[in-house]
UniProtKB/Swiss-Prot annotation, chains A, B:
Its EC number is 2.6.1.57. Disulfide bonds: none annotated. Its main location: cytoplasm. InterPro entries: Aminotransferase_I/II_large (IPR004839), Class-I_PLP-dep_aminotransf (IPR050859), PyrdxlP-dep_Trfase (IPR015424), PyrdxlP-dep_Trfase_major (IPR015421). Its cofactor is pyridoxal 5'-phosphate. One of its GO terms (cellular component) is nucleus. GO terms for molecular function: 2-aminoadipate transaminase activity; aromatic-amino-acid transaminase activity; pyridoxal phosphate binding. GO terms for biological process: aromatic amino acid family catabolic process; lysine biosynthetic process via aminoadipic acid; tyrosine biosynthetic process. The lineage of its organism: Eukaryota, Fungi, Dikarya, Ascomycota, Taphrinomycotina. SUPFAM superfamilies: PLP-dependent transferases. Gene3D superfamilies: Type I PLP-dependent aspartate aminotransferase-like (Major domain). This is Aromatic amino acid aminotransferase C56E4.03.
């Protein structure tokens, strides 16, 4: 039998610890002991007769319509969201368009919770999820729940700029953990925490780690199972809460084999789930992981529905925060998404995720092949990623032909970037992702295979190669 | 010619002043001086081919279908959101489902800005709007933009509990301004600010006022034009930023005439707009008003789309906050809403708002008539509201038959509430809305005419009258 999670309430921020429930939310559940329908004149909920959307429909791909050899190939199905329904497994507009609980509509929440159980099955009792208005909001809520102004937070040495922009205005110092090509180093994390000197850092020892373990942004690296276990053990040793930010989790891939093509692996849903790298959540016996899931990379960014999974303490405090920060995710989104998920079912959704996995594998292979073909090998180096949507590559600074100009790394990167844009290719500069600019001594660029058309990859990389050849001894 | 707004940057919080734009957002706009299409390998935007929603449709009421005497009476129209479109006035799914600007999709934003101009026409140059994930998020963003932990904020003596729950965990002291039946008192505001003693209050003089000017929650009161002008002048005198929270603005009504019916006034859109009480925004020559608008009461709470209107400084800082707090409103919501608004046009939307106005007037009249009929006049007193969805009424404490028990106001209200629920009617207790419990010496209840069916009003109020008669000398 699974154990109870640890009491980790000492991690709550002043803001979070002081949150209270609105009396109006609680009172909506009032019941009479008599057999009588309660007429509510309590909460200011508009009568659904004033909702001007009376039905919604969406065209979605039929299950396996994405497979060329399927009898459903190319087929679209229509799913409907009716105004009202007496079926308990329908989320009607009269509910979806109304004020809802901060945790999201029950039916969609149940679907996402069951999905989370299938994939991660957290090893303690009482875990739950809260739906949010997306991963961005998850992070804002989690940071405000756990940190006070003046705290420090552990992050990967290169990290997602918007996450850093969420942290710094809250008064947090971002402490970079060293990385190699396979993600961040447990030894570096242990070293920082073991030798923390609150006086010289000007803040108490960090108690929160923010990480993108799979297909990390920007480096594309994925932490191995062994590292994950070491890191979790370190989190226990140093009493750290792990914010596991996993938008790219389902974009896991087979190893790159040097070809601009990919096999559409005919594996079962069970095999697909089994091959996914174990998450921190799946090994979280203490309840010290807050996992943030997103639909942005696997359904659509515009859905603005994400969720976080955690132990009851963080769920309850997170719910109080969500109620006053965002109220709830869009009911229009939730209505359409639930209709789609219900139509597909858990298995149909896993089929879709396999399709996404295959599509990104193909895209990665195309982009890597273009890089292998066009980039000058004498100055560019990179590791083929096995997850995510990014390839991170170093450009050898020692071969820069204008070294006499004494430019900084950001200056060189900006100059190369401007020339690349002028030649018709946009990409991201390494310095945008550097947590501590004082220790930035290598030139990096990040390219993504998520967006451009496949036939554009060669053109884009050839253009960039030309820019490099003008600036580096190749 | 309208003037420039004042420089009010000294009002920004530490958090807000330190926000920076993500470099990735800026670089998406990179352009080449050559006549060349830029292939972007920069931002991690999924290719729209992976968005599983290929088209959305919604059934919405045809313009004036809500009028019994219209040729469109009862008619529904279908509006569609296609996957892609070359029309510049269509918001397609390929855009709506993608990552967007924090300010919202341009077309919907333009519609709401034009609507704001028609209604309020702010009297300075450069005002703008940002779409948010709803009014709740507007308030969270505004509070974090303007206040630091330890600050005080002016609020109405009775106020919206969720707003107070947004403020207090941020470390704000809520300073109640005295009210009468017509809203809060300018003299009380001036008195507090003129005599502010930072030492005894333990915080600097407030520089932010939070108010619900129209159909205030919970009191239903509406500030007169004269009071609004006085308050704006006081805001200038004491250098106050006004957070104008206006979810009930369009629920303005003619005076109650003692009848459970209402005339569906055949007035033009121009007359409708002209009769709306002037907002603080409409008199904001300095740019010191942040107006928060909501679709929750006039379209649907589940839309989770709101917007705030302010001068450029607050728009730019608010955008930086929205990007890291919520990213943007749901694109699925925005797609459906824009299709509806485009179909209706500005004039059609005003027709809809007149319908909402009429419907709420009818509901208010029904509920007031039920109250006039059933509530014991010797203990209950109330003022018919001219806006909003709430009626606030006092129950004379001096007639409480258990006065010897020495119960507090909240204890009496809770007891009455529990008995009411047991009898099958739910309503809200006055003490839930009290900002300073130390000065709570009157019994109040709040009822809403927004939700229940018209034929339930009599039953509900009769039940509550019975509870009062058991507890008060009537």
């Amino acid at each position: 039998m699974a154990a109870q999670p640890k009491d980790l309430s000492h991690h709550l921020s002043v803001e979070s610890a002081s949150r209270k429930q609105s009396p109006l939310k609680a009172v909506a559940l009032s019941k009479s002991s008599r057999n009588i329908k309660i007429i509510s004149l309590a909460g200011g909920l508009p009568n659904p007769e004033y909702f001007p959307i009376r039905e919604m429909d969406a065209e979605i791909p039929a299950i396996n319509s994405w497979k060329k050899d399927s009898s459903n190939s190319g087929k679209l199905d229509t799913v409907s969201v009716p105004m009202s329904s007496s079926d308990s497994d329908v989320l009607p507009l009269s509910v979806a368009l109304q004020y809802g609980q901060g945790s999201g509509a029950a039916l969609l929440s149940q679907f996402l919770k069951e999905h989370t159980r299938i994939i991660h099955n957290p090893p303690y009792e009482g875990w739950n999820i809260i739906m949010t208005t997306g991963n961005t909001s998850c992070l804002d809520i989690a940071l405000r729940m756990l940190t006070n102004r003046g705290d420090s937070i552990l992050v990967e040495k290169y990290s997602f700029p918007s996450a850093l922009q969420s942290m710094r205005p809250l008064g947090l110092s971002c402490i970079p953990i060293d990385m190699d090509q396979f993600g961040f180093l447990p030894e570096s994390m242990d070293d920082i925490l073991t030798n923390w000197d609150a006086t010289s850092y000007g803040s108490p020892k960090p108690h929160v780690l923010y990480t993108i373990p799979t297909g990390q942004n920007p480096t594309g690296s994925t932490l191995s199972v062994e590292r994950r276990k070491q890191i979790y053990t370190l989190a226990q040793k140093h009493d750290i809460i792990i914010l596991e930010d996993e938008p790219y989790y389902y974009l896991q891939m087979d190893a790159y084999e040097g070809k601009p093509e990919a096999a559409d692996k005919a594996f079962t849903n069970e095999q697909f789930v089994k091959e996914l790298i174990p998450s921190f959540l799946s090994m979280d016996v203490d309840g010290r992981v807050i996992r943030m899931d997103s639909l942005s990379k696997v359904v659509a960014p515009g859905s603005r529905v994400g969720w976080f999974t955690a132990q009851p303490l963080f769920i309850e405090r997170g719910l109080r925060a969500a109620e006053t920060a965002t109220q709830s995710a869009s009911g229009i989104s939730q209505g359409i998404l639930y209709a789609m998920f219900k139509h597909w079912g858990q298995d149909g959704y896993l089929e879709w995720l396999k399709h996404i996995r295959y599509s990104y594998t193909l895209r990665r292979n195309y982009l890597l092949y273009a890089m292998d073909t066009y980039l000058p090998k004498s100055v560019c180096s990179y590791i083929p990623p096995v997850a995510g949507m990014f390839i991170w590559f170093e450009v050898d600074k020692s071969r820069y032909i204008h070294a006499d100009k004494n430019e900084s790394i950001p200056e060189i990167e900006s100059k190369i970037h401007a020339e690349a844009v002028e030649e018709g290719v946009n990409l991201a500069c390494g310095n945008w992702f550097v947590v501590d600019p004082r220790v930035n001594d290598k030139i990096f660029f990040r390219v993504t295979f998520a967006h451009a058309e496949l036939e554009e990859f060669n053109v884009a990389i050839e253009r960039f190669a030309g820019v490099l050849k003008n600036n580096f001894k190749c």
